[in-house]
Amino acid sequence: MPGLFSANNLIKSRKAKRLADTAYRKRALGTKYKHSVLGRAPQAKAIVLEKIGVEAKQPNSAIRKAVRCQLIATGKKITAFVPYDGSVTYIESNDEVTVEGFGKKGRSVGDIPGIRFKVCKVQNVSLHAIFTGKKEKPSR
């Protein structure tokens, strides 16, 4: 049991030990936003460079469709997953796409290795709306 006048010492030791916690350190120092490709933004616009197929991790066997694109704001190149079956056909090279995060805490999802973003819009039209046939992709 700590002594009567040991509150200050307890506070000091708590602060020191708290810095060992990685989750706390990320929150306190704000490194989540410093090292994020999107910065503080939830979404970003990008130009498609090429379409690629990413092999799924074991035990699954599939080629997940993705696009390599360059962010307009920062100029950084990222890989973004294209959701919905066959919707990669709606995306061509040099199209403008909107990308957003694709997992918890900025990490990749499931059996798709190293892909932290997904495509949500093509030429400012929702990819889901194009996929379901509700809207058409505008021509340039």
UniProtKB/Swiss-Prot annotation:
Keywords: Hydroxylation, Ribonucleoprotein, Ribosomal protein. Pfam families: Ribosom_S12_S23. GO terms for molecular function: structural constituent of ribosome. One of its GO terms (biological process) is translation. The modification Hydroxyproline is found at residue 59. SUPFAM superfamilies: Nucleic acid-binding proteins (SSF50249). One of its GO terms (cellular component) is small ribosomal subunit. Gene3D superfamilies: Nucleic acid-binding proteins. Coiled coil: none annotated. InterPro entries: NA-bd_OB-fold, Ribosomal_uS12, Ribosomal_uS12_euk/arc. Belongs to the universal ribosomal protein uS12 family. This is Small ribosomal subunit protein uS12. It comes from Encephalitozoon cuniculi (strain GB-M1) (Microsporidian parasite). The lineage of its organism: Eukaryota, Fungi, Fungi incertae sedis, Microsporidia, Unikaryonidae. The gene is RPS23.
